[in-house]
């Protein structure tokens, strides 16, 4: 089987694990040692703003949350005011449960923007970063243009994902920026299946992967 990196993994009704019910998972890594991905449609009851309040900036780190004393909020420039609104809105997005493994660890899937301490290039359009510097930059002008934040990740051992695909537990489709960043969380599973031309009402256990 060819690598499923940069693919979306769509849970089928036949998948027996309730944790992954109607989930869409972005596959970050897939090789002979197994696979690793982030669920992109399983929100937890915490906003990004709430999460950032729990993170202490490193000594000398000047990128933090926007607050009433920020220079951004003091500007009368219309473009700056719009920027502050956009930043505020981005901080109100919900954090996602990326999977059942390492649920205290944060992962940021974002549009391509280098310069972080610990990043992996996933495609021309996407990167994943796990270092603290990007978390502290979220909510500032230094943040990537598009991003989602997850706690935890999903993992498969050698051959495990291949077996689950053969059992028709998953469908696959190439990653779509529209689904990742612009589609409401609750609609991502539906949009991903529609991309394959599948009618949700006719999904059954005898459908193989795409």
From Swiss-Prot:
A Gene Ontology cellular-component term: cytosol
A Pfam family recorded for this sequence: DUF179
Family to which the UniProt record says this protein belongs: Belongs to the UPF0301 (AlgH) family.
Protein name as annotated: UPF0301 protein CPS_1252
Taxonomy of the source species: Bacteria, Pseudomonadati, Pseudomonadota, Gammaproteobacteria, Alteromonadales
């Amino acid at each position: 089987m060819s690598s499923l990196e940069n693919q979306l993994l769509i849970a089928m009704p036949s998948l027996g694990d309730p944790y992954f019910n109607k989930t869409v998972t972005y596959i970050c890594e897939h090789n002979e040692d197994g696979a690793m991905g982030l669920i992109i449609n399983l929100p937890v009851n915490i906003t990004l703003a709430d999460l950032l309040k729990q993170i202490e900036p490193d000594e000398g780190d000047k990128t933090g949350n926007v607050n009433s004393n920020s220079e951004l909020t003091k500007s009368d420039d219309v473009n700056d005011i719009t920027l502050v609104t956009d930043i505020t809105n981005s901080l109100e997005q919900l954090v996602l449960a990326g999977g059942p493994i390492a649920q205290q660890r944060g992962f940021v899937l974002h549009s391509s923007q280098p310069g972080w301490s610990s990043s992996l290039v996933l495609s021309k359009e996407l990167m994943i970063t796990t270092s603290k510097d990007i978390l502290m930059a979220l909510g500032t002008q230094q943040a990537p243009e598009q991003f989602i934040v997850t706690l935890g990740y999903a993992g498969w051992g050698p051959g495990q994902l291949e077996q689950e695909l053969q059992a028709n537990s998953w469908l696959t489709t190439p990653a779509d920026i529209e689904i990742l960043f612009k589609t409401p969380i609750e609609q991502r599973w539906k949009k991903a299946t529609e991309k394959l031309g599948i009618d949700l009402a006719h999904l059954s256990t005898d459908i193989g992967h795409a």
